[in-house]
UniProtKB/Swiss-Prot annotation:
GO biological process: queuosine biosynthetic process; tRNA wobble guanine modification; tRNA-guanine transglycosylation
NCBIfam families per UniProt: Q_tRNA_tgt, tgt_general
Protein name: Queuine tRNA-ribosyltransferase
Assembly and oligomerization: Homodimer. Within each dimer, one monomer is responsible for RNA recognition and catalysis, while the other monomer binds to the replacement base PreQ1.
Source organism phylogeny: Bacteria, Pseudomonadati, Pseudomonadota, Gammaproteobacteria, Enterobacterales
Protein species of origin: Sodalis glossinidius (strain morsitans)
Annotated cofactor note: Binds 1 zinc ion per subunit.
Catalyses which reaction(s): 7-aminomethyl-7-carbaguanine + guanosine(34) in tRNA = 7-aminomethyl-7-carbaguanosine(34) in tRNA + guanine
GO cellular component: cytosol
Gene3D superfamilies in the cross-refs: Queuine tRNA-ribosyltransferase-like
Family: Belongs to the queuine tRNA-ribosyltransferase family.
Cofactor: Zn(2+)
InterPro entries, per database record: ArchSynthase1/Queuine_TRR, TGT, TGT-like_sf, tRNA_ribo_trans-like
Positions of substrate binding: D89, S90, G91, G92, F93, D143, Q187, G214
Biological function: Catalyzes the base-exchange of a guanine (G) residue with the queuine precursor 7-aminomethyl-7-deazaguanine (PreQ1) at position 34 (anticodon wobble position) in tRNAs with GU(N) anticodons (tRNA-Asp, -Asn, -His and -Tyr). Catalysis occurs through a double-displacement mechanism. The nucleophile active site attacks the C1' of nucleotide 34 to detach the guanine base from the RNA, forming a covalent enzyme-RNA intermediate. The proton acceptor active site deprotonates the incoming PreQ1, allowing a nucleophilic attack on the C1' of the ribose to form the product.
Amino acid sequence: MEYQLLKTDGQARRGRLVFDRGVVETPAFMPVGTYGTVKGMTPEEVKETGAQILLGNTFHLWLRPGQAVMKLHGDLHDFMQWHGPILTDSGGFQVFSLGDIRKITEEGVYFRNPINGDTIFLSPEKSMEIQYDLGSDIVMIFDECTSYPSDWDYAKQSMEMSLRWAARSRQRFDELGNHNALFGIIQGSVYEDLRDVSVKRLVEIGFDGYAVGGLAVGEPKADMHRILAHLCPQIPADKPRYLMGVGKPEDLVEGVRRGIDMFDCVMPTRNARNGHLFVTDGVVKIRNARYKDDVAPLDAECDCYTCRNYSRAYLHHLDRCNEILGARLNTIHNLRYYQRLMAGLRQAIDEGKLEHFVGEFYRRTGKPAPPLVVELHNNEGI
């Protein structure tokens, strides 16, 4: 993998990731394909939304179908028939999310298999081996996602163990002769001094990119923005920066403004299945009765298959009837919305007009702008 930094606008970066399997324009949003599928979508449909890279889930694909089945097909690309780049998480977030059915030790994590109840063990070394078999274009180190709230002492202990796991991940990755990319994950909760230690030591170990973990786990938005603004300038400029598990459209905008290059989140697909649709002027909750006889397209400014062919009334009808097609059409639209948002951010950075784009985004969606954005716009007369 090669990262090319093409342009900057303030802290925002316009770049390009070059893989053997294709090019990814950044800032980029990665749809989530937890089980080897973006729910309800064929790979061709996902590609048509503008997505250039997907995220897969190491933990779930390890449990089912397992490494043996994956290797029979070649790798995850062959298994799911997506031949663009794939990033896989390491399983570390499952440490965070499984709660009471886990036990964290220095060597790794013991889980109770949520499928059959068996006790299983996942270590940094095992995570690297699974991701090697998956053929991941971007491999993530194995870490612990520190919960929120955590006091400083616990956050320090967790961050330091994640650093030891990072070194073990790096060693096993190299032993396997893996020629793909390996990303480090910066931890430290909402404490700037801990984040400083984490990023410094990860850079000393050396990785192909750096992810910001442990955010969007319940902390106030102001803390997320503060940590990103503090942290991004410390990440080497020639390496991509990935904000894990984020997020809402406004989170993508604010992440880009602070120097983030890559994002992933289940929000566009999960919300689509619940009738919560993102549009240029905000949100359409398609289940509401007001859309029963609305013949307008979902979003007149959107070029997706759904908006080009169907009315709000039809989407409302499908949702009320619990038709599978409704969830699919909603998903197509939400994923396209996210890709259009990222394309708009890229163009704005290219043209040196990011702050104008940000101002228009908040004006059109009717969301309150974070204080920093308000201050900038007031100064610039936007």
